[in-house]
Amino acid sequence: MQLTGAEIICECLLEQGVDTVFGYPGGAALNTYDALYKYSDKIRHILTAHEQGASHAADGYARATGKTGVVMTTSGPGATNIVTGLATANIDSIPLVAITGNVTTDQLGRDSFQEVDIVDIVKPVTKASFLVEKVEDLADTIRKAFALAQHGRKGPVLVDVPKDVTANKTEFVQLSLIHISEPTRLRCI
């Protein structure tokens, strides 16, 4: 099915069992927030007073539930405001996925309004950070982010998604979730 990048983000969150997202919206993340509103019956958004609070809330949620915490912010100062929360999650091995908006891909590297290279900024305090420049790469990148956050030494992973990537459409193939039942107990006679 054809979906926008923003809808793909929401579908991938559902695939990962995410039911709660913490964040603070802004211009570069509005497409994602519009899609998140359409999914509000399945994914609850907790609006915080500040992005730093959102990152700490996602960390606390992960600690309390055992699930991967998710934080969403916009570009520039919105993205840099979550760095302390990511560092905390990294130091304490807490699984967290941060999804940040950014300026459009044609404006990257041009000192555009509220543009910042958040991918490089967070490298010292995350397990990995990714810039998604094509909508076709978005689903696999989000899935990889969750896998990295949850396996080995747990920790935060950041996915930076430019605004045009969230607006563009591509074919989305949902992962088939395989249910593995509990093994049957056998008795030896």
List each language-model region with its residue ranges:
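Thiamine diphosphate
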Residues: M1-G78
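Structural signature of the thiamine diphosphate
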Residues: D19-T20, R63-T74, A79-T100, K123-L175
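Alpha-helix capping and helix-loop boundary segments enriched in small/acidic/polar residues
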Residues: G23, A49, T73-T74, G109-V116, ...
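Anionic group-transfer/hydrolysis microenvironments
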Residues: P25, P162, T184
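Active-site-proximal loop->helix
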Residues: A35-Y37, G60, V103-P124
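Short, hinge-like loop/turn segments at secondary-structure boundaries
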Residues: K38-D41, R63-T65, Q114-D117, L148, ...
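Short, acidic/small-residue loops that bind anionic groups at enzyme active sites
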Residues: K42-H50, D92-G109, P124
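Single conserved hydrophobic/aromatic residue that forms the stacking wall/gate
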Residues: I178-I189
